[in-house]
Design a protein with these regions (language model features):
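Substrate-binding pocket helix/loop in short-chain dehydrogenase/reductase
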Residues: 95-96, 103-105, 190, 202
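Active-site helix of classical SDR
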Residues: 119, 155, 163
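Conserved glycine-rich cofactor-binding loop
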Residues: 7, 14-15
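Short C-terminal tail/terminal secondary-structure segment
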Residues: 144, 222, 233-246
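Residue(s) in the substrate-gating loop at a strand-loop-helix junction
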Residues: 139
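Short, small/polar-rich loop/turn modules that mediate ligand/substrate recognition or access, typified
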Residues: 171, 176, 232-234
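Alpha-helical segment proximal to the catalytic Tyr-Lys
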Residues: 124, 168-169, 230
Length: 246
């Protein structure tokens, strides 16, 4: 049980990659808290089925007060978070010239600014405990590009910069911070919103000739959250089947 006794906070854990991460950490022994604007009942049920302890509440992570309140609730229910995974995301396709300022701001606020609020809330306890694992879910689009997604790519690039910069500040306290950059991943949401031929086109560009799954990303996150990954920090791991290899 790789994460036995640890408390993990996962944003965006009600579905998709976030749900797979929450369930993987739970199966490997962590107590899992899920922060999401959507109902997390399905994920909590999956955690219970696997014998894992979970807690979830609606939380708009773009609002500092809601983040602070949620982290306080997690501390009272499960203990202070030792693992933070930021997976919540605003993602849509829109050409830059058609993008409204409100859409731009919402994307930046949820995808990257919310990480500021989360870190402010969890870092004091991590530093006091001299241990922590922080993982931001970025995107391979920062490396390979994607049409009509400049707003999204910008927000994910900011997370990569945060990881690179903050690693030096938190490292002396036994805390690592890394990013995982998924390639195109087959989720229910992606299936519902993206054309099927896009998946085939991306597979053709990959070294590994299959669609990526949420479980692929969860496996990388689980490793980075473990004791074994204690000497890895400030890094962005591309989990994209080799599409973005350099």
């Amino acid at each position: 049980m790789r994460h036995r006794g640890k408390v993990a906070l996962v944003t965006g854990g009600s579905s998709g990659i976030g749900q797979a991460i929450a369930c993987r950490l739970g199966r490997e022994g962590a107590k899992v808290a899920i922060a999401d604007v959507a109902e997390a009942g399905e994920t909590l049920a999956l955690l219970r089925e696997s014998g894992s302890e979970g807690f979830g509440a609606r939380c708009d992570i773009s609002v500092p007060g809601e983040v602070a309140s949620f982290v306080s609730q997690v501390g009272a229910r499960l203990g202070p978070p030792q693992i933070l995974v930021h997976s919540a995301v605003v993602q849509f396709v829109r050409p830059f010239e058609e993008l409204s300022l409100e859409e731009w701001r919402r994307t930046q606020t949820v995808n990257q600014e919310s990480m500021f609020h989360l870190l402010k809330a969890v870092l004091p306890e991590m530093k006091a405990g001299q241990w922590g694992r922080i993982i931001a879910i970025a995107s391979s689009t920062f490396f390979v590009g994607a049409p009509a997604m400049t707003h999204y790519i910008t927000s994910k690039g900011a997370l990569i910069g945060l990881v690179h910069g903050l690693a030096a500040e938190v490292g002396p306290f036994g805390i690592t911070i890394n990013a995982v950059a998924p390639g195109l991943t087959r989720t229910k949401s992606a299936d519902a919103t993206l054309p099927g031929d896009l998946f085939r086109q991306v597979v053709a560009l990959q070294c590994i000739k299959r669609n990526g799954t949420p479980e692929d990303q969860a496996a990388v996150v689980s490793f980075l959250a473990s004791e074994e990954a204690g000497f890895i920090t400030g890094q962005t791991i591309l989990a994209d089947g080799g599409q973005g290899r350099t």
